[in-house]
Amino acid sequence: MLNPVWLKSLVAIVQTGSFQSAARALGLAQPTVSQHLQKLEEQVGVTLVQRSRSGCQPTTRALAFMPHATALLDMHARALEALHGNRERVGASSNIGTYLLQPFVRNYLTTANERGEVDLRIAANPDVADQLLAGQLDAAIMEWWLPHPDFEYRLWRVEPLVLIVSPDHALAEAGCIERDRLVDLPMLGGEPGSGT
């Protein structure tokens, strides 16, 4: 098992470009960061950083490993959060997250009995659905939902779909318009995957 403390040191070295800067960023002594890297290199059996008088450079293997190291650190942080935290990961499609959800989040944060936090992620509807399916969200509020056997869904609210036309357009005074009258009209709508 890779030690997350050692991984943090490697990531800091690669990101800052030096042992001294990495130590400063981590709030550690420079020899401690060097020791972390040495132990990690011994464990994995490859050199991760080339040291020279002019500084240090990550090896090709270190660069290939970096996405995995950062993913492991992220997973480690999420695991600790799951054990000790009270953070809800909520995804919302763009319009909902921007215009409708904010007062509900604020109300939750001010009335939660425990110290609660909300990690609100606003994205396009398809991206929110993908994050929910990947287990990256605890809940999602979306403009549309295709039923999925692993999830329970509930209708939160219904918003009217409004047609906006110029005052001289034939439909300007039409009131409620049947869907069939709209089929052949050129229209601008929301981004692909949105509910509009």
UniProtKB/Swiss-Prot annotation:
Domain named HTH lysR-type: residues: 1-59
Residue spans binding DNA: 19-38
GO molecular function terms attached to this record: DNA-binding transcription factor activity; transcription cis-regulatory region binding
Keywords annotated in UniProt: DNA-binding, Transcription, Transcription regulation
Lineage: superkingdom: Bacteria
One Pfam short name: LysR_substrate
PANTHER family, alphabetized: HTH-TYPE TRANSCRIPTIONAL REGULATOR, HTH-TYPE TRANSCRIPTIONAL REGULATOR CYSL
UniProt record similarity statement: Belongs to the LysR transcriptional regulatory family.
Protein name: Putative HTH-type transcriptional regulator protein PtxE
Source lineage: Bacteria, Pseudomonadati, Pseudomonadota, Gammaproteobacteria, Pseudomonadales
